[in-house]
Amino acid sequence: PAPSETTGESTPAPSETTGESTPAPSETTGESTPAPSETTGESTPAPSETTGESTPAPSETTVPSGESTPAPSETTVPSVPSGESTPAPSETTELRIIPPEVSTVAVPVTTGQITPAVTTEHSTEEILTLPPPVVGPVLPAKPTVDISKYTNTTTTKSTVPTTTIPPKATCCGSSGESVQAGHMWQTGCDVCTCNGTSGKTQCAPRQCEKEIICKSDERRVLRKPGKSCCGYCEPLTCKHNGTEYKLGATFIDKSNPCITYRCDASGLTVNVKSCPNEQVCSKSERTYDSDGCCFSCDTSCKPVPATVGIQGEYDYQNEKTNCSANIIMAKCSGQCQHKLTYDTIDNKVVTKCRCCKADRVEPRKAHLVCDNGKKKIYKYKHITSCKCTSCTAYNIRL
């Protein structure tokens, strides 16, 4: 059998590199350079296949465990403590493993014998080649800025006594609710504030933006809660006995018709009316003017209507019965002029009185109603005219 092919020289190229890649060498005639897998601490020889009997011819020399150098595919970056950051280098360190040089010696072969190939190991030394480290920014473990010059290194103990601020008091609001200190609200025409120190409510009149200017026929009302807090103008009016009168109105005093009031801008003015040629007569003989203040006595003697009640007892079919009725008659009314004369004999003033009396009459009838339901005819004289005559004259019988 032909011996298995032995690798003349083998140069492993790592399958993975970080940062830079190393290409595998090209194949040469008579020599094959396989690309080994990742190197671990030991290499296991791959026995060659033989016909009949197999004699292992290791293609790779076993590397002693004491001299094995792992070829990591990736570079391990040391961990950085908390608070410090170290940037990773831009290029990964390349680990290059140079395997020992192996040579094969040809041995004469006798017919019928299988002679394994003899492998002579010239060197078992492994060389680890590292590129120069890449210099990059490295954060220091401690800050490089000296902050001592920005701070006061001397420590002084404060001697200022600490004071405890008491909680702010609350106040009672307009509706009885509790309000916080400094809270403001409006009640009527006042603005109230809660005093947080004393817990009392302080109120002051509301401040108005502009002054109210009224016309000559108006007056200024300063404050009227519910209508205006800053004042307003209203027409001038006058009040008398609970009645309000507009500006320029006139009215008569109800208790004294001779007094007239007038409502002016300055208030009420009073005018008392005087009655000329006052006369003396009974109230029934007075005729008043339109104001009801002055009157004149009726000097004309004339008949005026008067209601007279008539009642009597009468015989009706031999029975007595009471009959009565109210009849509208006439009477003489008016004032007659009196005459004054001087008596030279008695040396005194004599008054001649004249009275208003009936001058003419006419007969009339009236119906009286009796208790038995019957009616009785009553005859009387109705005055149709009057005149002033001497008071001693006899009266006309009615």
UniProtKB/Swiss-Prot annotation:
Question: What domain of life does the native source organism fall in?
Answer: Eukaryota
Q: Kindly indicate whether the keyword Membrane belongs to this entry.
A: no
Tissue-specificity statement: Expressed and stored exclusively in mature mucous glands of the skin.
Q: Give the span(s) annotated as 8 X 11 AA tandem repeats of G-E-S-T-P-A-P-S-E-T-T.
A: 1-93
Q: Name one GO cellular component term.
A: extracellular region
> Which portions of the sequence form the region Disordered?
1-101
Polar residues bias spans: 1-92
Name where it's found: Secreted
Q: Return the sequence repeat spans.
A: 1-7, 8-18, 19-29, 30-40, 41-51, 52-62, 66-76, 83-93
Q: Which UniProt keywords apply?
A: Disulfide bond, Glycoprotein, Repeat, Secreted
SUPFAM superfamilies associated with the record:
FnI-like domain (SSF57603)
Q: Which cysteines link up through disulfide bonds?
A: C301-C356, C323-C370, C332-C386, C336-C388
Broad class of where this protein is predominantly found: secreted
Q: Which residues form the VWFC domain?
A: 169-234
Q: Which Gene3D superfamilies match?
A: Cystine-knot cytokines
Please state every residue range assigned to the domain named CTCK.
Answer: 301-392
User: Do the record's keywords include Transmembrane helix?
Assistant: no
**Modification(s) after translation:** Extensively O-glycosylated.
Functional description taken from the UniProt entry: Could be involved in defense against microbial infections. Protects the epithelia from external environment.
Q: What is this protein called?
A: Integumentary mucin B.1
Organism whose genome encodes this protein: Xenopus laevis
